[in-house]
Every structure is written in structure tokens, then in C-alpha cells.
A protein has these predicted regions:
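Conserved ABC transporter NBD signature motif
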Residues: 62-70, 79
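Conserved ABC ATPase "signature" region
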Residues: 114-130
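Hydrophobic anchor residue at the start of the ABC signature
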Residues: 147-148
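Conserved ABC ATPase signature
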Residues: 134-138, 142
Length: 225
């Protein structure tokens, strides 16, 4: 087994509102090619934790390191290309699917590889003709898959996924789970995935469980049968 390099480290991270501790004293690491799930009941701070890692909100205490650097010292634009965040309700823009998939390449001032879109669309069981489909004509499941494909165009080192299969039927949910699992192994991308779905645990290297009382965190390795 090749040695994994550390991409992300959280050290005693916490976040609170004026009256409530949402997340408290969270510490863990994420290595290249590692697949971690974050689970727990509603309101225990799962999405807040992911937003802090995405640098959308800042922790009140503690530090988050990306490749050894405090993320508050990094360019937000550059960081978010390497750490890609995909949410439960995807925000697509422009007129067509193509407008969304070309966007990450435009930011990098690069041309996409000739088969970049076709390969990823095929992985997610979407036809290449969908590139010209209006955003308004997409189903909820199509929007979620397109948003995920768009995130992959950034060629990220870390994928942050927040309940991304919630709008999918069972077939597409299993398909997305399998695709992400293979993508992690093939590209050595790290994944931090917030989910309520116990079926997704089978792909995880480790599972982080947050409890309703902030400050309680359990981390367990998932033992495959």
C-alpha cells in the first residue's frame, strides 16, 4: 500500500452563535485518497463543520490546515478550486449545462480536454446531448449530477459533499456512490461526505459521528465484510 499524504487537518475547531455552541473541539485529519463520512442527527453541526472546511465560515477557535497551511492565509479562490464543495440543493447558472461545465476551465484559463465532458457525463449515465439542455429543463436528479460533474472539472484534491444524493432515486443514488468511490481510488482524491444514509457507509474508510451535544465526536474505522 502506498503511503498517503495528509491534505487536511482540523485542530480543536469550534464554532458558536451568540448563545449556542454548534461545533466544539473537533480534531481529525484527511489524507489523499481517504473517504470519510460525517454522520449524526439533525442539528449536531455536520453542515456547519463542512462549511468551515470549505472556508465559507471561519471557526471561532482552533485551526484548519490544508497541506500544512492555515486556510485563512490562503487565497479563497485558489483554495476553493482545490477543495470543491457540493451541496444538497445545487446552484446552477447560465443558460445551459455546457455553461456550467466550462466554467472551471475558464477560471483556470485552460481549454478542457477533448473528452473531459463526455467521459464524466457517461460515468453519471447522462448523454452528451445534455450539454445544450437548458438549466430550467433539468430534473432535480440531473441538476445534482451536473453540479457534481462541474465540481470534478476543477480537478480538486478534496471533495466536500453535503447530502448530495438526497434528490436522487435509488438507482442513481447507488450509481453516484459507486462513481465517487471509484473516482477516489483512481484519482486519489480525498472525500469528506455529510450524510444520513447508512448505505453510503459501506464505501467509507472511516466514519465521524457527531452527537447533539457540541464537543462530542466519535471516529471509527468502517470494517468491510
Amino acid at each position: 500500500m502506498t503511503e498517503r499524504s495528509m491534505l487536511l487537518e482540523l485542530k480543536q475547531v469550534g464554532y458558536r452563535t451568540a448563545t449556542t455552541k454548534i461545533v466544539n473541539n473537533i480534531s481529525f485529519t484527511l489524507q489523499r485518497g481517504e473517504f470519510k463520512l460525517i454522520t449524526g442527527p439533525s442539528g449536531c453541526g455536520k453542515s456547519t463543520l463542512l462549511k468551515m472546511v470549505a472556508s465559507l465560515i471561519s471557526p471561532d477557535i482552533g485551526v484548519i490546515l490544508f497541506e500544512g497551511q492555515d486556510i485563512t492565509t490562503l487565497s479563497p479562490e485558489a483554495y476553493r478550486q482545490q477543495v470543491s464543495y457540493c451541496v444538497q440543493t445545487p446552484a446552477l447558472f447560465g443558460d445551459t449545462v455546457y455553461d456550467n461545465l466550462i466554467f472551471p476551465w475558464q477560471i483556470r484559463h485552460q481549454r478542457p480536454q477533448p473528452t473531459a465532458f463526455a467521459d464524466d457525463l457517461a460515468r453519471f449515465e447522462l448523454p452528451e446531448t445534455i450539454l445544450q439542455k437548458p438549466i430550467a429543463a433539468l430534473s432535480g436528479g440531473e441538476k445534482q449530477r451536473i453540479a457534481l460533474i462541474r465540481n470534478l472539472q476543477f480537478l480538486p484534491k478534496i471533495l466536500l459533499l453535503d447530502e448530495i444524493t438526497s434528490a436522487l432515486d435509488e438507482h442513481n443514488k447507488r450509481n453516484v456512490n459507486d462513481i465517487i468511490h471509484r473516482y477516489v481510488r483512481d484519482k486519489q482524491v480525498a472525500v469528506l461526505w455529510v450524510t444520513h444514509d447508512k448505505d453510503e457507509i459501506q464505501h467509507a474508510d472511516k466514519v465521524i459521528t457527531l452527537t447533539p451535544s457540541a464537543g462530542e465526536m466519535q471516529e471509527a474505522r468502517y470494517e468491510r465484510a
